Amino acid sequence: MYILKIAYDGRYSFQQQPHKQTVCDILLDALEETGFLAKKKVIYSGGRTDKGVSALGNFVVVELKKEPILSYINAKLKDKGIWVLGYREIDEIPKVKYRHYRYILPNIGYDVDAIKEGAKKMIGTHSFHNLSKRDRTKEKSPIRTIYDIKISENEFYLTVDIIGESFLWNMVRKIVGALDLVGRGKKPVEWIDKLLDENHREGVPTFPPEGLILVEAKVDIEYIYDNYSIRKFKEYWGEFFKLQVMKIGIAKTVLEFTK
């Protein structure tokens, strides 16, 4: 077995699905076309993400015939917004120590201190039944453990870093939805306590997937990295960043000159 560290830009959902292009399907096709794939199946992954959610440090475990050459694989993926950044041969599936998600929230004049106070209440082990979407295909306990939530800000956006053992469907996006209401003064900080009360039921907005990135699914693996692939990956995101800065400038100009 091999573990592959992968990144992607959110244009596809992650999990294999019939008659749909997904991160897993596209990756498996690339591994097959380059002659590395032994079995067309993802054995295990670090996290399943929805369409719109990006990833920097997700991983998949797959059966390969031989040691992969990442530059060959990434050449097949270059127009898909998917990259294999590292790999390691393994004998058993590694345990994920934690998952780190980051949400980028436009800075609209939030009460950041209130957001930080609300976030503190979510740290620890709680029932996140109000802060997740039920997956009807699986009966899962809503009890989850959040290790840390950190809030930072600049002129344009807030960064919400959430680190936990595991997450329920839409849990991070609903946590951000709750913090948004607190930060805009629509709900008091104490409202978070009600959301975490296992006997209380209340709907919470789910924020868009485009603001979310899986920073890392942490495992005790020393990946073998390919410098060329890393360089091309950084070049892509460098160009992406420049384009977004231009778009921000255009948007500000439109708002400035529109009466």
From Swiss-Prot:
InterPro entries: PsdUridine_synth_cat_dom_sf, PsdUridine_synth_TruA, PsdUridine_synth_TruA_a/b_dom, PsdUridine_synth_TruA_C, TruA/RsuA/RluB/E/F_N. Pfam families: PseudoU_synth_1 (PF01416). Its EC number is 5.4.99.12. It comes from the Archaea. One of its GO terms (molecular function) is tRNA pseudouridine(38-40) synthase activity. Substrate binds at residue 101. Keywords: Isomerase, tRNA processing. Formation of pseudouridine at positions 38, 39 and 40 in the anticodon stem and loop of transfer RNAs. Belongs to the tRNA pseudouridine synthase TruA family. This is tRNA pseudouridine synthase A.
